Amino acid sequence: MYNKVILVGNLTRDVELRYLPSGSALAKIGIATNRRFKKQDGSQGDEVCFVDVNLFGRTAEIANQYLKKGSKILIEGRLVLESWTDQSGQKRSKHSVTAESLQMLDSKGASQGGYEGEDYSSYDSTPSYGATSSAKSAPNTQAPYKEPQIPEINIDDDEIPF
């Protein structure tokens, strides 16, 4: 199966950064994407889609440092279903995107010390404790991508609304 999402849009709110008990950073952002289309009567239609996105590790910290409400970004990631029980005991769920890479697209950043078009992939999303960087290591080597630990969703087919 293939699960890949690519979104270009603007942040709907400032980055919400917190740290997990493991020490890894988690940033929650919201993105608004627009789709323009031609209606049957010939006029232009505009459809806005709001998407919640989770960023992990160094990517989350970079997003918190450089992004703010209104920033234009490109996200590559995967679609996930989050499930929880609310305060009244109701089972709730929603779709969100777990980002695997982030590109900042604002052109104004280029003139202010710049981050335009930089790609911050979260291949290092799991923290490395006690690791030291060596000047003798081979250039352009990257650590392999490690999937963040996401708990398995326990849901019956009868609970799915469609």
Swiss-Prot record:
Gene3D superfamilies: Nucleic acid-binding proteins. Residues 85-101, 122-143 have a biased composition (Polar residues). The keyword DNA damage applies. Keywords: DNA damage, DNA recombination, DNA repair, DNA replication, DNA-binding. Signal peptide: none annotated. The keyword Aminoacyl-tRNA synthetase does not apply. PANTHER family: SINGLE-STRANDED DNA-BINDING PROTEIN. This is Single-stranded DNA-binding protein. It comes from Wolinella succinogenes (strain ATCC 29543 / DSM 1740 / CCUG 13145 / JCM 31913 / LMG 7466 / NCTC 11488 / FDC 602W). The lineage of its organism: Bacteria, Pseudomonadati, Campylobacterota, Epsilonproteobacteria, Campylobacterales.
